[in-house]
Amino acid sequence: MKIRETIIDFATLPAQQKHDFFQQMLEFDQLIFPFASVEQLYQYVHDPEAVSVPVIQYFVGEQLIGQNIMPILKLQLQDKPIFVVTSRAGVLEQYRRSNLTLKTAIRVALRYRLRYPAIPLWFVTTLMQPKVYTLFASRSRYFYPRKGYTMPTAYQSVLELMHRYKSQVDKRGQGIYVAPALMPKVTPDQLIRLRKRSDVHYQFFMQHVPDYFDGKGLMCVCRLDFKTISETIMNLAFGKSVH
């Protein structure tokens, strides 16, 4: 099974192409996030702070089987510019066994890091499944929050800056913020199976977000510097996990 990927910067498309491509994105997005509104996706890809909106799509033959929308926002933190990458990703269930979206997202981040080396690049996401949190936390020691480590001040400042994009943020500890998250299409049995793990990252997530069943997610942050990117690439390549 050969998976083909395409990357299109939604922000650079002419108006008519934007309209047509948005309809394609929306159709697939609703397969993954059936409870999300059209307005949510529209605002996400038309964020006025976005300098680029890479959209990575994955195909098997002509069938679209996965999608990752990654707006890159240019914001100000303490009067200095920073870039913040967010992600809205989904893959059809039968293709979820590989780190498909993570691998390509790293490549996109690396290109942007090389293009603008003087401006810090951050990744901020709200994760509502312990399995997905574990995927990220187990690949880099610099993905926060995490068990046994205090979140650095700079990381917390970026996380707090992104509160503006959430309707409600609940602080549940030092550096622990829980907010509404996109609910993917899953069955109750699938959600229950996500809990049957003893991994340290699973336990940490469940300790702080036991109500993820209700659409709550853990706000997470990672600085995408060369140290973090290279560590993640190596851990993915060799199947290594970190605690």
Label for each model-derived stretch:
Residues 1-22, 26, 30-32, 41-57, ...:
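Terminal substrate-recognition subdomain of acyl/acetyltransferases
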Residues 53, 57, 62-74, 85:
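Conserved beta-strand in the GNAT
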Residues 75-81:
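A short, polar/charged loop-to-alpha-helix boundary motif
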Residues 83-85, 122:
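Structural motif
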Residues 88-97:
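A short, internal acetyl-CoA/4′-phosphopantetheine-binding micro-motif in the GNAT/acyltransferase core
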Residues 89, 109-110, 116:
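Internal, hydrophobic cores of structured domains that mediate oligomerization or house catalytic pockets
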Residues 96-111:
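Conserved acetyl-CoA-binding loop-helix of GNAT-fold acetyltransferases
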